[in-house]
């Protein structure tokens, strides 16, 4: 039978994207994917390799260096007792309209994700050269123009419904939004990550440099998560413990720029009870980047106790607690607000929300800080509705005073020219530091 030219091309297209693709080499339990090139979408071939080798015990999918793989559509890779090697680079497409309209939605702050990894007993490994992700973030930074939580910006890596998972040796450059979200998962290890969000748009002049919302990693509804050996350079939280994050261990983290490590935000939704409990942060270093100031180091944030506005930037009157937290072996260099608690959170900056600063019922208890050194900049802030400066601020809500907060071997120097208060305490039971207020 003789095929017409158009029929032959059609069949060839099915061959490239279907099970007979010559760019997916299958040998037993091992699958290797080569990219199509020329901007063509590699997602179908990656998913085919995962189907063939990703759910078989001992299976292995390889996306080797030095190749770049185009991710032109959302994808879910389900792995069971297998390994995904990402030695190459996953480059997300620049089709903003597609991603805004088609990314996976999550039920927290109307956020979105682009690549979901689900399953159990799996490994995702970037290899010795740390392959990983290029989120094509610059176009998103310019598109959002410094707006907070602009709808539709997708997170490039979403660990979802996963148990006994290991992700290691991964670089994420120019994430579109938060780089990594671990959600509804348990016993997850994330080791040796590098995350960098850098803006090159000269129109960005404000303090955020348009790279806010480029968190390194957020945990949400997850238990027993280990985060070790991370380097983060960007414009937002390096690590953030979102609602119902329990038994989290963070160690050996270097942070360049942004707000630092956050416990929150919490208490945003009035119909939810948020718990953050059994958290350890050990051996973390904070300093400014070439683009972004180091706004804070370790901080805790809960929403106002009045449901004002709607998420992602409004809300409040949620309930819950942060309990059993240990923060130790911390170094600050030129950090504006080294350690503080904020119970007056809202992102409706043009509204008079500070009138609700003493309304939060969210509780912070059993917080312990030890072996902390470095310097703060005594930068003025008005997050409480007052103009204040400090090295440590434990200002808690009258409706939910903080209890059992201890400090041991803490030495945070402020500028010699600064003559104001260094330790602020209100509605807080603090031991180990002399409160000035």
Swiss-Prot record:
Q: What Pfam families does the entry give? A: Glyco_hydro_28
Can you tell me which residues form the catalytic site? 236
Q: What is its EC number?
A: 3.2.1.67
The record lists glycosylation at: 30, 101, 110, 161, 196, 203, 244, 252, 278, 324, 352, 371, 382, 387
Q: Which SUPFAM superfamilies match?
A: Pectin lyase-like (SSF51126)
Provenance organism: Aspergillus oryzae (strain ATCC 42149 / RIB 40) (Yellow koji mold)
GO cellular-component terms in the record? extracellular region
Q: Where is the signal peptide?
A: 1-20
Query: Where do the PbH1 repeats start and stop?
Result: 222-243, 245-265, 276-302, 322-343
Reactions listed under catalytic activity: [(1->4)-alpha-D-galacturonosyl](n) + H2O = alpha-D-galacturonate + [(1->4)-alpha-D-galacturonosyl](n-1)
Q: Which family does it belong to?
A: Belongs to the glycosyl hydrolase 28 family.
Compartmental location: Secreted
The first-level EC class reads hydrolase
Q: Report the protein's function.
A: Specific in hydrolyzing the terminal glycosidic bond of polygalacturonic acid and oligogalacturonates.
Q: Which UniProt keywords apply?
A: Carbohydrate metabolism, Cell wall biogenesis/degradation, Disulfide bond, Glycoprotein, Glycosidase, Hydrolase, Polysaccharide degradation, Repeat, Secreted, Signal
A GO biological process of this protein is:
cell wall organization
Q: List the disulfide bonds.
A: 396-402
Q: Which named protein is this?
A: Putative galacturan 1,4-alpha-galacturonidase A
List, in alphabetical order, the Gene Ontology terms for molecular function in this entry.
Answer: galacturan 1,4-alpha-galacturonidase activity; polygalacturonase activity
